[in-house]
Amino acid sequence: MNPVQQPAQQRSPASSLPHPKRAQEAPDMALYCDNFMYPQQSLHPSQRGPNFAIGEYTSPANPYLWLGGHGVNNAPNYSPSPAPYMPPSFGAPQRQFLPNSPAFGGTELSWMSAASQEELLKMVRPPYSYSALIAMAIQHASDRRLTLSQIYQYVAENFPFYKKSKAGWQNSIRHNLSLNDCFKKVPRDENDPGKGNYWTLDPNCEKMFDNGNFRRKRKPKSDANSAKIAKIGEDHLNPKGKESPPMITPSSPEEPSPTGHSKSPSPPAVTYTPCLTNFIGSMTAVDAATANRQGPLGLLNELSQRNISSLSSFISGSAVDQSAEHPDTSLFYNRSPYYSSFPTTAQKQPQFLQQPPLYQGRY
């Protein structure tokens, strides 16, 4: 730092005279960061010691704790009076903040010098929920029960933060008492005069309160929900109890047969729809039309006679059995066949089905 220039009229005549500088001399003005030394006036070499070491300065009785230094030193052997621009309270003893106490872990907060321990408690909100404060107050009571006003009193006395505004946190405490299942209301006895009921802590919830951490007890589920969940679990464990619906169902519901004799039920896969019955009937009509004709397709006629005749015999037997189930199936047999009889002569293919000739033009 540059030395502070002093006015000419404040200097003594002896200090205004030029003196030769020596290598071992200390500078006229210096600032020691460790000791917060303020600049001093220039003195004659005969008035100061030959060497000034830092260890020679005495430390004050009450240091500045947040810097860990030696504090401001107003050594009378170095300067008879402080500089006029320094405030008189700069080197005044400071009050130590937060004495050693196990609650704050020794001098962890000793670097703060703005307020005392009580002022800190008023500024900082306690790290406890309202339910924890209520449980703490009830546990500290002699008979483990307190009224609402006694809970207010305990919170305000032990936590000065809540002394500032009482309306807000008192409403929160009332809501926690009424909504939390761990707090039980106990009516007053007849011989106990006073106003208001007592509040106590549920014995099942006492273990849940541990060092200010209060976990709210959940309400048990209703019996209906538990029974429903148990039923769903049984259904998943025993899937064989349920019967799966058949993969193939008949086209129409089965009705009791008018005939007295009993018959064996047919499997679902053999049930025929009206569309299939109509198709087989049309094929039977085609077989009847081609049986009286002679054409070049002899092998085809023979195969068709064999296959369709067997189908017709099977249909004739099944149609009698299904006459009661499908009374309108005769309409399908009376219809004209979908396909006409096989042609006796070969027909010419349409032009769009014929293979196109190769392109004979020039490329």
Swiss-Prot record:
Among its keywords, does the record have Nucleus?
yes
Name a single GO cellular component.
nucleus
Q: Which residues bind DNA?
A: 125-219
Q: Keywords in UniProt for this one?
A: Developmental protein, Differentiation, DNA-binding, Neurogenesis, Nucleus, Transcription, Transcription regulation
Disordered: annotated segments:
1-24, 210-269, 344-363
Keyword Transcription regulation appears in the UniProt entry? yes
Q: Which InterPro entries match?
A: Fork_head_dom (IPR001766), FOX_domain-containing (IPR050211), TF_fork_head_CS_1 (IPR018122), TF_fork_head_CS_2 (IPR030456), WH-like_DNA-bd_sf (IPR036388), WH_DNA-bd_sf (IPR036390)
GO MF, one annotated term? sequence-specific DNA binding
Membrane-spanning parts: none
User: From what superkingdom does this record's organism come?
Assistant: Eukaryota
One biological process term from GO is: nervous system development
Q: Where in the cell is it found?
A: Nucleus
Query: What ranges does the record list as Low complexity composition bias?
Result: 1-18, 244-258, 347-363
Q: What is its main location?
A: nucleus
Q: Where is the composition biased (Basic and acidic residues)?
A: 231-243
> What does the protein in this record do?
Transcription factor. Essential for ventral specification of the early cephalic (head) ectoderm during gastrulation, playing a role in the 'non-neural' versus 'neural' cell fate choice. Binds to DNA via the target sequence 5'-[AG]TAAA[CT]A-3', with 5'-ATAAACA-3' being the preferred binding site.
Protein name according to UniProt: Forkhead box protein I1
Origin organism is Xenopus tropicalis
